[in-house]
């Protein structure tokens, strides 16, 4: 197993059977990231060590945790994602950088206890907030985006 499981998240962070083209896009992002870091595919320990930096918020001075009411469904989770995107855009407008980190969701009991989350709340994600170091190779990585026609279809326009 290459991915840590922690205590086990309360939701599937990724689909259990990630299929093409999503699997391919995820793989490409991972390869680009580790190439920038100089960590070859075969260096499992190096990749695990880098992944562990998530749990130090990559050295960011500020962290944000987000939880969701357990009674909410996919529409509200979508709303929450849009709200987080707006938070990230507002941070950027103020000169701050951010990194959403769903990896925190694999420690729901530990983080939930630390945050004193009520039983009806579920840990959704964490976020690093600070200033990117543009001298570091990963802080300048821009991942490839799929063409709009591959991800959306506009009918009647």
Could you describe each region identified by the protein language model?
Residues 1-157:
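Acidic, surface-exposed loops and disordered segments
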